[in-house]
Amino acid sequence: MSTEKLKHHKIIFVVGGPGSGKGTQCEKIVHKYGYTHLSTGDLLRAEVSSGSERGKKLQAIMEKGELVPLDTVLDMLRDAMLAKADTSKGFLIDGYPREVKQGEEFEKKIAPPTLLLYVDAGKETMVKRLLKRGETSGRVDDNEETIKKRLETYYKATEPVIAFYKGRGIVRQLNAEGTVDEVFQQVCSYLDKL
């Protein structure tokens, strides 16, 4: 199946640190605009639990703590996008690209992004939100030390990506310090113009 038809879709990369609220904003965008939300993490987990050949290979890679090859991630994104191409009004690609090369490969194999939404919350805010989430989520990676490490990794990886797309003029930065609705108002002001 050709990726040709994906070129006419709106494709939005959503980038934001852990605790920035990007998951919540993605849900609201899906609800209001009829976009399809694709998270690379969810796709990988679904593939593993499907028990497919690809899933078994992925499980072995992830159990070793290694990074899943870029080609595999792109194939999964492309398959998921093509499966929804006829019914979706657009795509939110969540947690991708994590580096400039991933963005370039995405364009080569799939299509160029329409926008990059940068859900930007300050470090303090993200730490606070994650600690609060940790009280109820039971997620082992929601303790302060791990959180600070995750944020460091996130900033290191994301800054060049943001700079790359700023150079193209497609970054829309959201001040994610406000309430969910305040942040969503900013989102709408950008998406309504597309």
UniProtKB/Swiss-Prot annotation:
Region feature LID, mapped onto this chain: 132-142
Binding positions (ATP): 19-24, 133, 178
InterPro entries per UniProt: Adenylat/UMP-CMP_kin, Adenylat_kinase_CS, AK1, AK1/5, P-loop_NTPase
UniProt cross-references to PROSITE patterns, sorted A to Z: ADENYLATE_KINASE
Effect annotated for changing residue 129 to A: Reduced enzyme activity. Decreased Km values for ADP
Temperature notes for this entry: Thermostable.
An MF annotation (GO) of this entry: ATP binding
Region (NMP): 39-68
pH dependence: Optimum pH is 9.0 for ThTP synthesis.
Annotated keywords: ATP-binding, Cytoplasm, Kinase, Nucleotide-binding, Transferase
UniProt catalytic activity: a ribonucleoside 5'-phosphate + ATP = a ribonucleoside 5'-diphosphate + ADP; AMP + ATP = 2 ADP; dAMP + ATP = dADP + ADP; dATP + AMP = dADP + ADP
Subcellular location: Cytoplasm
Domain notes: Consists of three domains, a large central CORE domain and two small peripheral domains, NMPbind and LID, which undergo movements during catalysis. The LID domain closes over the site of phosphoryl transfer upon ATP binding. Assembling and dissambling the active center during each catalytic cycle provides an effective means to prevent ATP hydrolysis.
PANTHER family the record matches: NUCLEOTIDE KINASE
Primary role: Catalyzes the reversible transfer of the terminal phosphate group between ATP and AMP. Also displays broad nucleoside diphosphate kinase activity. Plays an important role in cellular energy homeostasis and in adenine nucleotide metabolism. Also catalyzes at a very low rate the synthesis of thiamine triphosphate (ThTP) from thiamine diphosphate (ThDP) and ADP.
Quaternary organization: Monomer.
Name this protein carries in UniProt: Adenylate kinase isoenzyme 1
Native source species: Gallus gallus
Gene behind this protein: AK1
